[in-house]
Amino acid sequence: MEKGTFHIKTGFAEMFKGGVIMDVTTPEQAVIAEEAGAVAVMALERVPADIRAQGGVARMSDPKIIKEIMAAVSIPVMAKVRIGHFVEAMILEAIGVDFIDESEVLTPADEEHHIDKWKFKVPFVCGARNLGEALRRIAEGAAMIRTKGEAGTGNVVEAVRHARTMWKEIRYVQSLREDELMAYAKEIGAPFELVKWVHDHGRLPVVNFAAGGIATPADAALMMHLGMDGVFVGSGIFKSGDPRKRARAIVRAVAHYNDPEVLAEVSEDLGEPMVGINLDQLKEEERLAKRGW
């Protein structure tokens, strides 16, 4: 898929709105995700829960695995690169992935610089905990933003925090007078033009998805109620007892997040959810959301 201008990239991301993007590690899982109604899949060697459990350096997945997943499904395929690792991004662009996630779930390759995403035809999604982070990533060329949450924990609390923080800061920007915007742009380290856009429109200039710790249909619906455009689900599906049923349930929960009766129906008899991690048990260095700036 030939992609280039920022307008085309962000338009492509708009097509995912109201949908669920699922982490998959095999072509078989990708087919389950597609049949369940996922709008795209994220091709990985290990889901975040395994990356967290196994430790070591987490890198871009083997291109062979990604190509096998691309061959198995007709929906768009995304893949992750390390923060700042533009050569991994060049490789993914060369094999034809539809979207690249510059992800804090992998071990950062550069602690000072994110990738210059303008140099790529393929669009990027990046994580953000607050408005400043989101606008910096957009200034670097990101066509889509997601909450960072705390991936691989099955605990939605950080994703909720990041979503609420983003909207709180957007509302604050809207409350400012025009002559106060420059000082605020300096304070949060974001370009004035983007801060002004947020002030005028009351939202981010790109699609904003929820990600990190979403494990149940109720979690997914909660994030939609908090104003997210859609949901990434990582470990929550294929680390659960009945992945096929849970995948379908989460897709339906996102589509019908305003209907408690549907939510009750899809939440029934899903088998065991992923075990999950209480964030109080995480050491500071194990918190993935703090990676990047």
UniProtKB/Swiss-Prot annotation:
Superkingdom of the organism of origin: Bacteria
Active-site feature positions: 80
One Pfam family matching this protein: SOR_SNZ
Binding site for D-ribose 5-phosphate: 23, 152, 213, 234-235
Keyword Cytoplasm appears in the UniProt entry: no
Pathway involvement of the protein, from the record: Cofactor biosynthesis; pyridoxal 5'-phosphate biosynthesis
GO molecular function: pyridoxal 5'-phosphate synthase (glutamine hydrolysing) activity
EC number: 4.3.3.6
Reactions catalysed according to its record: aldehydo-D-ribose 5-phosphate + D-glyceraldehyde 3-phosphate + L-glutamine = pyridoxal 5'-phosphate + L-glutamate + phosphate + 3 H2O + H(+)
Presence of keyword Cytoplasm: no
Key words, A-Z: Lyase, Pyridoxal phosphate, Schiff base
Record's function text: Catalyzes the formation of pyridoxal 5'-phosphate from ribose 5-phosphate (RBP), glyceraldehyde 3-phosphate (G3P) and ammonia. The ammonia is provided by the PdxT subunit. Can also use ribulose 5-phosphate and dihydroxyacetone phosphate as substrates, resulting from enzyme-catalyzed isomerization of RBP and G3P, respectively.
Assembly information from the UniProt record: In the presence of PdxT, forms a dodecamer of heterodimers.
Identification of the protein by name: Pyridoxal 5'-phosphate synthase subunit PdxS
